[in-house]
């Protein structure tokens, strides 16, 4: 039996579920995903439009299936739907033992609704239900963005008994809206007679992009005081989000009533944890965000960095919200418009996923056209 890497095992022991932010057919076929489960404490997988765009554009792992779908007359949307849901279903099966061993907390695989629907509530709900039926695995999570149109969709999808990964959360205010949508959805699910213990949700809070945006603005200000604040906002923001999570899930009467009926907490998930600035430690968004009942989804490069030299000293979040708030107070005092930062990041987040989806559509369409000749 392969042994787990000690740094990642320490992270797991501290209450952080390690998920891989990547999926490809090669990773599934080669046994690499299973290897990461066995040696690097990986207990979940997240995907997004950019990940699938990369997987389908590299190598030839999908060629035979695309050719077969072309022969059957599948259009580009149906082709992408089939190849991505097949990968996700297979990943669900690989992770099923972890799902069973954790009582349904981990062993989860996420698939995102079409990013072009980010501002359309009803179509998001419809597609979430379709994806849930197509993949047909209890350890699936449907990713829905935390846009204003996404919030009612999240509640409606949870009310159907479907597990949800809420993505593209950048601000604590929006995170509060997401937790409210979770409670609303679970209350409706209870009224509809669903087993609440079977419905799972995580709230994916993006970290590194916050630093990238705020650091750029601090550099434009250029004062010594501004430059001294670089690299602090992302972690501070996530720590404030965890404090908000604790308020709701450790004391709120609405949640306590649901808990008595079997509902679990909506765990914070740290996403966008690959460090983009080479001046910062490449494990910054892992070792500084350790707390019970959290998930950290990492690109493989970050996973390897933590395995190699990540220093995990236990809980690094609880009790830090005062210091985190001070960072935000200083940012605002120096002229950083935080609400504008979060609006920009949400718009860019949706646009990036839409652009990746368009690239995926265009590349797959070109492949289908070539096969039709």
From Swiss-Prot:
Molecular function terms from GO: transaldolase activity
Compartment(s) of residence: Cytoplasm
Broad class of where this protein is predominantly found: cytoplasm
Single GO cellular component term: cytoplasm
Name of one Pfam family that matches: TAL_FSA
InterPro entries: Aldolase_TIM, TAL/FSA, Transaldolase_2, Transaldolase_AS
Cytoplasm as UniProt keyword: yes
One Gene Ontology biological process: pentose-phosphate shunt
Catalytic activity: D-sedoheptulose 7-phosphate + D-glyceraldehyde 3-phosphate = D-erythrose 4-phosphate + beta-D-fructose 6-phosphate
NCBIfam families in UniProt: PRK03343.1, tal_mycobact
Biological role: Transaldolase is important for the balance of metabolites in the pentose-phosphate pathway.
Similarity comment text for this entry: Belongs to the transaldolase family. Type 2 subfamily.
PANTHER family: TRANSALDOLASE (PTHR10683:SF31)
Protein name from the UniProt record: Transaldolase
Organism: Mycobacterium marinum (strain ATCC BAA-535 / M)
């Amino acid at each position: 039996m392969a042994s787990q890497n000690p740094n990642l095992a320490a992270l797991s022991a501290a209450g952080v579920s390690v998920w891989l932010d990547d999926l490809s057919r090669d990773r599934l076929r080669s046994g690499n995903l299973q290897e990461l489960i066995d040696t690097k404490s990986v207990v979940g997988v997240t995907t997004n439009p950019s990940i699938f765009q990369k997987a389908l554009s590299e190598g030839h792992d999908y060629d035979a299936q695309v050719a077969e779908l072309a022969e059957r007359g599948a259009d580009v949307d149906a082709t992408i739907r089939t190849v991505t849901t097949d990968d996700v279903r297979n990943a669900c099966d690989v992770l099923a033992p972890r799902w069973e061993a954790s009582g349904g907390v981990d062993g989860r695989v996420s698939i995102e609704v079409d990013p072009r629907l980010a501002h359309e509530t009803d179509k998001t709900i419809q597609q979430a239900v379709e994806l849930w039926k197509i993949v047909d695995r209890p350890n699936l999570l449907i990713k829905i963005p935390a846009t204003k149109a996404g919030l009612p969709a999240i509640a409606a999808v949870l009310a159907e008994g479907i597990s949800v990964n809420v993505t593209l959360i950048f601000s604590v205010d929006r995170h509060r809206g997401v937790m409210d949508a979770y409670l609303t959805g679970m209350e409706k699910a209870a009224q509809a007679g669903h087993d609440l213990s079977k419905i799972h949700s995580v709230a994916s809070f993006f970290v590194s992009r916050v630093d990238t945006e705020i650091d750029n603005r601090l550099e434009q200000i250029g004062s010594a005081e501004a430059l001294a604040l670089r690299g602090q906002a992302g972690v501070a923001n996530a720590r404030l989000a965890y404090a908000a999570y604790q308020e709701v899930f450790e004391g709120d009467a609405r949640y306590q009533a649901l808990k008595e009926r079997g509902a679990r907490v909506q765990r914070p998930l740290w996403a966008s944890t690959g460090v983009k600035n080479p001046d910062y430690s490449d494990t910054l968004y892992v070792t500084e965000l350790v707390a019970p009942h959290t998930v950290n989804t990492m690109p493989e490069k970050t996973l390897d960095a933590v395995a190699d030299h990540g220093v995990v000293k236990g809980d690094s979040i609880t009790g830090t919200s005062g210091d985190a708030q001070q960072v935000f107070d200083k940012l605002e005092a120096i002229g950083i418009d935080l609400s504008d930062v979060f609006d920009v990041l949400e718009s860019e987040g949706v646009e990036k996923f839409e652009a990746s989806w368009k690239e995926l559509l265009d590349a797959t369409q070109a492949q289908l056209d070539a096969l039709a000749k």
